[in-house]
Each structure stands twice: as structure tokens, then as C-alpha cells.
From Swiss-Prot:
Keywords on record: ATP-binding, Cytoplasm, Hydrolase, Nucleotide-binding, Peroxisome, Protease, Serine protease
Stretches assigned to the Lon N-terminal domain: 1-230
InterPro entries, sorted: AAA+_ATPase, ATPase_AAA_core, Lon_bac/euk-typ, Lon_lid, Lon_proteolytic, Lon_Prtase, Lon_prtase_N, Lon_prtase_N_sf
Active-site residue numbers: S799, K842
Residues covered by region (Disordered): 249-269
UniProt-recorded name of the protein: Lon protease homolog 2, peroxisomal
GO molecular function: ATP binding; ATP hydrolysis activity; ATP-dependent peptidase activity; serine-type endopeptidase activity
EC number: 3.4.21.53
Main location per the UniProt record: other
Organism: Sordaria macrospora (strain ATCC MYA-333 / DSM 997 / K(L3346) / K-hell)
């Protein structure tokens, strides 16, 4: 196949005619004459698939002369050529055509008989004999096969060289096909013609081979060319063994083109070389003496490893890998793998640490830092300050020990010198010196054992979203002066993401822990393991939570081994702080390794303080406003908290404040653009919120002004955390058969609380004055209906037991409960009132709803100490341990028996 430049109409006519006529057959060994059109092509030889074997087909053949086929004359024809059969014509969009031709036989032009639309002459064809009858030719043929296969093998190995070296090569697939073709070839002439187009030779030598009609002479000439090139290759480099790490020679592709044969380059101590020696040499050695790129890279890597102060085991492995790297050529894949591994070792902070700011003012500074960044969270702050205090004391002890060790080392050094100077003195003096040295060494060893080892605690902060777990860990790092790194564990399903991938895998890399150490560059950072409760469980990819066991075990993490690094790494200096929203999904062994600190949701009072001190100023800055242009009052913020958000954290609160700020920004911009800035009112009121935030999303329950029998005010803490409120318990009776109907989307536990309360009331109806006889059933011919308003909101929990019992007594007795009194507590069949949770949130909600008196279980007395002072001042808190006590506080004017008058029967096993 060859492209034709600027074909004329007569050329296309001839091509079509010859295409219709088809080819011709030439008998073997015959020489016949026939007329044939001749074209002096200006294209190099192409293969059967239309691809160049070695050369670039777009480059011009400079020695063939700039002959235009449209203007060619008989003087431009070479006497010998190839008869070809046209197998197809392909058109191009540029107006050019491509002829697909297939070579048939070697020809000799005897005479040009026509020079019109095209050159036509009489030619003689020469076909190679089909059988080998000469033993000398057979021997030459075997030598040609052997040398050809050797040459193809070298070309295949050349593909391992970098592309920038300019060395041509064959892909393994093409090389195998060529080797198969050579092995199966039966005709010496055909193989000689084929190899003549592959071997490096001049254009004149190629023409010479074309003129050789005798097969023996042609094979001998090609063997000469092959032997010359293989000899040049062997003289230019030493190919000792073909192994997985051996590399081939370079070969200049331009040298195969006619007229561009370059003289070989000789290097000192070498034979004839090739034009472009490969960079970096072979087997990791040699190469161009002036090219120091790879040696410099390895030298720089060695300097980085030395500066990293590796552990003894890491240094040993690094030295071994450096030696391997020097023997590997940069073009091999193993070179990049080894270099990346060594770079990882150099980037890991084996001994580099940041000095903790543990001065005399450490605790005060840390306390101020935590208070400035977070409001409330006293338990968490207390634990972190305890850690800082312990760290401060340990450092003070270690500093004293280091001073004593230094003094003893100086004394031992002086004693040794005196011993050397007095070597000629009697042996008694030498014994005294030896005894001092031994005593000093023992004392030195004892002092080293007194050094305090810093084992950082592993804290787990558990709480709902948005309460400040992540920012709290960042504040700890700031207070300590350490670097901070966050590792997100949510959605991690592969153990290799924690421990790393083994180096045998393609694109292997270290795990998240080692990558974090590389990023911070120190061995004692603060690591935040975010969302540890969302780590995937056991699967075909391993168990990531099990991989975390070694990381978070203070007794083991000083010897943590990453699969990629495969060298023990000390993680004992890392302060790990994990966060979770729930403990339910954390495996028990992993949970046992961490110190759990619960962070409850913020109360309404805490949210108001956070909003006024932090969120409002932040959102004003974000929206281009200042405090003089928008004024948020505590009443406005409280309204946003109570009516537009219901969450444990403050994220939605910040969004709502941002919405209000943007609305005020629009008003301010409109007033300013209209030229009437005086019309803008920076003051925000509660009534303005509906304009910016829409209608209220949540309606706050308010204590009723009037009281009625069968209605009791209970207390509830929302599952979202941080918020609490009051909950009305409504009970009504009607004629019936003793059935109980429950509504209000009540959970199973809450339904059981109603049954327990009803059973206690029925059992003590006579003592309560509800029946005339102990044997009378108060539910005879009567049914009751228990309802909790806000029927669309799910409700559950045992804390309304006391409220249910008081509501039933109120209904049956006709006595109303004071509307300003609320109560919470679980009731048992014996009438005991037991502890419940969410006391802080419930009482804050009760104060906000207008409640004055609250009945709490006596077991919750400890929770009252954590209440804000304004809640303690605004509520009368009464602690009860039995339902009879609660009844006396609710209806103090009634005559009620005491608890001791009616002791319950308890079974003891």
C-alpha cells in the first residue's frame, strides 16, 4: 500500500483498468517478457497490514530524489523493481488516493516502449525456485533463520527502554508473530527479502539486494547485513544474561532511512557503540557518564532517609531497598514501586515530634481555649484538662531525670579519663575507678527506668450530630500546640484502607493512619477518627473494625504494622479522639479499648448563649452585615430555637439565623439603593421571624391556666436531644366493660406504663377512697380512654408512669391537679418511683412552659446538680420515692395513708 501524490485523471484511468484485469501468475524459475506500466513510487515499503515495519512512513526518502510521479520519465526508473497486483483503491478526503498493492515477483526493465499517459515497458520476471537443491544454500538458509530470530529477540527486548531514549522496539505480540513467521518460512529468498527491510542498512544496500537474482547471493548479503548489526550491538554493550531485569540496546530509527546512516559512537573502553545510549545504563549501572539524573535521584533519596532518622529495623530495610534500586533500570515497573516505597519510609515521622506547650500556664491556657471555643460540655473539658495535667507532671519528672542522667554521664566521663591518665598507678586505684564506673552505670540504668512513658488516652466522644465533637478535638490540638488530622471512617468497608495494601498489589499504598502521619509530619499529632460507629463490618474485604483494634490499643499500638510499610510504627504518642453518634454499632472489643465520654445535646439556654456569642456574629460577617445594621435580641433567638428548630446541636439553628440575616441584608440593600436608608429598621422582633422563616414549624406546649380532673402535665425529652417540653396526659371514662383505649401514637413501653398505673390504682382503690369496699372493682361497667396530644408525634418511654397514675386517681376521685405542677418518673407495681433520663432537658422545657412545681424521682437528685442556676431558681423541685408521697404533694388537703401502712409483699429467692 502506498499513497500517491496529486494523481491525474490518466493515472486513475490506468489504475481502474489494471484493477479490472487483475493479477498475473509467474511460473517458478521462469523469465518471461511482457508489457507493464511502471511507477517510480516515493513511499517506503509497507507491510501487508499497511503499517511500517521499522521506519516512519510520513518521512520522505531523501536519497531517492524528489521525483514527481506525474512528471517521471524513463530516466528516473531503476532497472530492477517489483511487479505488484492492485488489490484495491481507497479514496481520501484530501483528493488523494491510496492504492493497495500486493507484490508478486522481482522484475528487470528490459526496454521502455511507451511514454504517454504512463510509462510502459517490457520487463523480465524472476521467480525464486520452490525447492532447495543446493546444500550450501540450505546451510545459508539455516544461518539466516538463526540470525534473524536472534535479531527479532533483541528488537523485542528494546521495547523495555524508555521512549525518550530514541530506541525502536517491537511489541511482544508483534515479535512473537515475526518469530513464528521466520520459523515457518520455507523459502530462503522470501526470508532474505523480508529481513532486508528490517535490518539496518542503507538505501543503496537495499537496491543492491533487489538486483540479486541468485538466491544464494541474496541470502549471503542479508546474512552479512544482519551479522554486521548484531556485531555492532554486542560491541556497544554487554548483554550477559537475558533475565527479567536485563535491558536491550538502543537503535536510532533515523539510521534505517536512506541517506541518514550515522557513524557509530565509540565510548572509552568500548567497541562500536550506538547513536543514543540509554539513560541510566543497564541493570542500574553504566550509561552515559554525563547523565547523572538517576544517580542524583537515588542520592537525594538516601539523604532524605538519613534525615528521617529511621528506626533500626526501618534503616536496615531501607538500605536493602536502596541497593536493589541501584540495580534496577528506571524503565522497569519495579523501579517505581521501590522508589515509592522508599519515599514513603522517608516521609513517615519516625522520631520527629512537636513540643507540647506544657508550661506553668498550661492548664489555664487550655481551659480558656476550650471555654472560648465551646460553651458547656463540662465533662469533656474536665477529662481533657486531666490529661493535660498528667502530661505536665510526667514531663516535669522526665526533665528532672534527664538532668540527673546528664550529670552522671559527665561524672563517668571524667572518671574514665582519670582512670586512663592514672593507668600506671597501683591496681587498688584501678579497682576504685572500676567500682565507681559500675555504680554509676547501675544508677544511670535506674534513672532511665524512672522515665515516664507517655501513653496518650484514646477518647470516644458520643453524642448527636452538631454538638461540637469534631471542633472539640481541634480545640484540644490547639491547646496542646500539636498538629491536627481528621480521618473520616464513615463508609470504610475495606480492611486495607486502615492497614494499607501489600506491596505486591498494583498501585498499593499505605493505610489511612500512615497517610495521616505522613501528612502531619510528626509522631505526636491529634488524630480525629470521625464517625467510628459507621465503619463497615466483616465482609470479603476483611473487617475494618477489627483492624482498628491494634490502632486503638494503648498496649499494642507502639508496634503497629502497616501492610504496605511492613515495619513496626510507634503510635503510642498519637492522641486519638474518636467520635460516634451511637454505641450500638461499635463492636464490644473495640468499644472496650476507648474511654467513652457522652456529650448530650445542648439545652435551650446553651443554644441561646452559643447563638448570641458565636453564631449571630459569624452569620452577620458572612452576609456582609455588622451588629449596627442588624440587632438580634435574646427573645428573637429563643423564638427561633423553640419554634423553628428541634435538634441536639446548632446546625439548623445556624441555618435559620443565616436566613434571617440574608432577609435583613435584602432590606438594607433595597433601602440603600432607593436613597432612603432611614426607612431601614435594624431592630429584629419576634413578629419579623414569620416574614423571613415562614410559619412556625414547632408549637411549644404551654401550661394551662385552669385545671380539670383527669388531666396531668408530664415531662418529655425529645429523642433528637437537647430539647424538652411538657406533655399532657388526658384520661376520660365512659360506661363500658372495663376496656382501656390508648391513642396518641404511643409506644409499647408507654402502653405498658398505663397498664401498670391502672393496676396499682385498681389494687388501692379502697385506700384511695375510690370504692366503698376492698372487693369492689372500680372498672366495673366502666371503660377509660387515655390520650397524649400531638397524635402525629411518636411517644414512648416509661417516664410517664407517675403522671398516668395521678391522672387516673384524679379522674376517679374528681380532684383536679394544679396546672402549674408537672411530674416525671417510672412507677412499679409496688408504687415505687424510679429514676428516668433527660432531667436537664425536661426541667428547662418545664420552666419555659410556665411550670412552677416539678415532682422528680428521688434517685434523680444527682441530676439536679447539673441544672443551670436559673432553672433551679425558677422551679420548685420535689423529690419523691413512692406514689403515696406524690399523692400527698398533689393534694395536700386529703387524708392519705402513708406508705408504711400498706407494705407490699416482696419475694426473695
Amino acid at each position: 500500500m502506498a499513497p500517491v501524490r496529486a494523481p491525474t485523471a490518466r493515472h486513475r484511468l490506468v489504475a481502474r483498468r489494471r484493477l479490472r484485469e487483475g493479477g498475473f501468475q509467474t511460473p517458478n524459475g521462469a523469465s518471461i517478457q511482457f508489457p507493464l506500466p511502471a511507477y517510480p513510487w516515493q513511499s517506503p515499503l509497507l507491510g501487508p497490514e499497511g503499517n511500517l515495519l521499522i521506519e516512519n512512513g510520513d518521512n520522505k526518502n531523501e536519497t531517492s530524489g524528489d521525483v514527481d510521479p506525474a512528471k517521471a520519465t524513463k530516466a528516473d526508473l531503476f532497472p530492477y523493481g517489483v511487479a505488484a497486483k492492485i488489490t484495491g483503491v481507497e479514496g481520501r478526503g484530501t483528493g488523494e488516493f491510496t492504492l493497495l498493492v500486493e507484490g508478486v515477483t522481482r522484475i528487470h526493465v528490459e526496454k521502455v516502449i511507451a511514454d504517454k499517459a504512463y510509462l510502459e515497458g517490457k520487463v523480465s520476471s524472476y521467480a525464486d525456485p520452490a525447492l532447495i537443491t543446493d546444500s550450501a544454500l540450505e546451510e545459508l538458509f539455516m544461518s539466516l533463520k538463526l540470525l534473524s530470530r536472534q535479531f527479532v529477540t533483541i528488537l523485542r527486548l528494546s521495547s523495555l527502554l524508555p521512549q525518550s531514549s530514541g530506541t525502536p522496539g517491537l511489541s511482544p505480540l508483534l515479535a512473537r508473530r515475526l518469530d513464528f513467521y521466520i520459523a515457518k518460512q520455507k523459502y530462503p529468498g522470501a526470508l532474505a527479502d523480508f529481513m532486508a527491510n528490517i535490518v539496518e542498512s542503507t538505501y543503496e544496500e537495499k537496491l543492491q539486494i533487489l538486483t540479486l537474482i541468485d538466491v544464494k547471493e541474496r541470502v549471503a548479503k542479508v546474512i552479512e547485513l544482519l551479522d554486521r548489526q548484531v556485531t555492532n550491538i554486542k560491541n556497544s554493550m554487554k548483554i550477559t544474561t537475558i533475565t527479567a531485569t536485563s535491558l536491550p540496546f538502543p537503535m536510532d530509527p533515523d539510521s534505517t532511512k536512506p541517506g541518514k546512516v550515522k557513524p557509530p559512537v565509540k565510548a572509552p573502553g568500548q567497541g562500536v557503540g550506538m547513536p543514543f545510549p540509554p539513560q541510566g545504563g543497564f541493570m542500574g549501572r553504566g550509561g552515559n557518564p554525563d547523565d547523572e539524573q538517576e544517580p542524583n535521584e537515588i542520592e537525594e533519596l538516601q539523604k532524605r532517609l538519613d534525615a528521617a532518622r529511621l528506626s533500626p529495623e526501618a534503616a536496615k530495610i531501607a538500605d536493602r531497598e536502596i541497593k536493589r534500586l541501584k540495580k534496577i533500570h528506571p524503565a522497569q515497573a519495579e523501579y517505581a514501586v521501590t522508589r515509592t516505597y522508599l519515599e514513603t519510609l522517608a516521609e513517615i515521622p519516625w522520631t520527629a515530634t512537636t513540643d507540647d506547650r506544657l508550661g506553668p500556664d498550661t492548664l489555664n491556657r487550655a481551659r480558656k481555649q476550650l471555654d472560648d471555643d465551646h460553651y458547656g460540655l463540662d465533662k469533656v473539658k474536665k477529662r481533657l484538662l486531666e490529661y493535660l495535667a498528667v502530661l505536665r507532671l510526667k514531663q516535669a519528672i522526665n526533665d528532672d531525670v534527664d538532668i540527673q542522667i546528664k550529670q552522671i554521664e559527665q561524672e563517668l566521663g571524667v572518671g574514665s579519663e582519670n582512670g586512663k591518665e592514672d593507668a600506671a598507678q597501683p591496681a587498688a586505684v584501678d579497682l576504685t575507678v572500676d567500682e565507681k564506673v559500675k555504680a554509676g552505670g547501675a544508677k544511670l540504668e535506674a534513672l532511665k527506668n524512672r522515665r515516664m512513658v507517655d501513653k496518650s488516652p484514646i477518647l470516644l466522644l458520643v453524642g448527636p450530630p452538631g454538638v461540637g465533637k469534631t471542633s472539640l478535638a481541634r480545640s484540644v490540638a490547639t491547646a496542646l500546640g500539636r498538629k491536627f488530622h481528621r480521618i473520616s471512617l464513615g463508609g470504610v468497608r475495606d480492611e486495607a484502607e486502615i492497614r494499607g495494601h501489600r506491596r505486591t498489589y498494583v498501585a498499593a499504598m499505605p493505610g489511612l493512619v500512615v497517610q495521616g502521619l505522613k501528612k502531619v509530619g510528626v509522631a505526636n499529632p491529634v488524630f480525629l477518627l470521625d464517625e467510628i460507629d459507621k465503619v463497615g463490618g466483616s465482609s470479603i474485604h476483611g473487617d475494618p473494625s477489627a483492624a482498628m483494634l491494634e490502632v486503638l490499643d494503648p498496649e499494642q499500638n507502639h508496634n503497629f504494622t502497616d501492610h504496605y510499610v511492613n515495619i513496626p510504627i510507634d503510635l503510642s504518642k498519637v492522641l486519638f479522639i474518636a467520635t460516634a453518634n451511637s454505641l450500638d454499632t461499635i463492636p464490644a472489643p473495640l468499644l472496650d479499648r476507648m474511654e467513652t465520654i457522652y456529650i448530650p445535646g445542648y439545652t435551650t439556654l446553651e443554644k441561646r448563649h452559643i447563638a448570641m456569642q458565636h453564631l449571630v456574629p459569624k452569620q452577620l460577617r458572612v452576609n456582609g452585615l455588622d451588629e449596627s445594621q442588624v440587632s438580634f435580641t435574646p427573645e428573637v433567638v429563643s423564638k427561633i430555637i423553640e419554634s423553628y428548630t428541634r435538634e441536639a446541636g446548632v446546625r439548623n439553628l445556624e441555618r435559620e439565623i443565616s436566613s434571617v440575616a440574608r432577609g435583613k441584608a435584602v432590606e438594607f440593600a433595597d433601602a440603600k439603593d432607593s436613597g432612603h436608608p432611614e426607612n431601614y429598621n435594624p431592630q429584629l422582633t419576634v413578629d419579623d421571624l414569620e416574614k423571613f422563616l415562614g410559619i412556625e414549624k414547632f408549637e411549644e406546649e404551654i401550661a394551662e391556666k385552669t385545671s380539670r380532673p383527669g388531666i396531668v402535665t408530664g415531662l418529655v425529652a425529645y429523642s433528637s436531644g437537647g430539647n424538652g417540653s411538657i406533655l399532657f396526659i388526658e384520661v376520660a371514662d365512659m360506661p363500658g366493660n372495663g376496656s382501656v383505649q390508648l391513642t396518641g401514637k404511643l409506644g409499647d413501653v408507654l402502653k405498658e406504663s398505663v397498664e401498670v398505673a391502672l393496676t396499682w390504682v385498681k389494687a388501692h382503690a379502697y385506700e384511695l377512697g375510690l370504692t366503698q369496699s376492698p372487693n369492689e372493682n372500680i372498672m366495673k361497667d366502666r371503660s377509660i380512654h387515655v390520650h397524649c396530644p400531638s397524635g402525629a408525634v411518636p411517644k414512648d418511654g416509661p417516664s410517664s408512669g407517675i403522671s398516668q397514675a395521678i391522672a387516673l386517681i384524679s379522674l376517679f376521685s374528681g380532684k383536679a391537679v394544679p396546672s402549674t405542677m408537672a411530674m416525671t418518673g417510672e412507677i412499679s407495681l409496688r408504687g415505687r418511683i424510679t429514676a428516668v433520663g433527660g432531667i436537664k432537658e425536661k426541667l428547662i422545657g418545664a420552666l419555659r412552659a410556665g411550670v412552677k412545681t416539678v415532682l422528680l424521682p428521688a434517685q434523680n437528685r444527682k441530676d439536679v446538680k447539673d441544672l443551670p442556676q436559673e432553672v433551679k431558681d425558677g422551679l420548685e423541685i420535689i423529690h419523691v420515692s413512692h406514689i403515696w408521697e406524690a399523692i400527698r404533694y398533689v393534694w395536700p388537703d386529703g387524708q392519705w395513708p402513708s406508705e408504711h401502712d400498706y407494705p407490699s409483699v416482696e419475694s426473695r429467692l
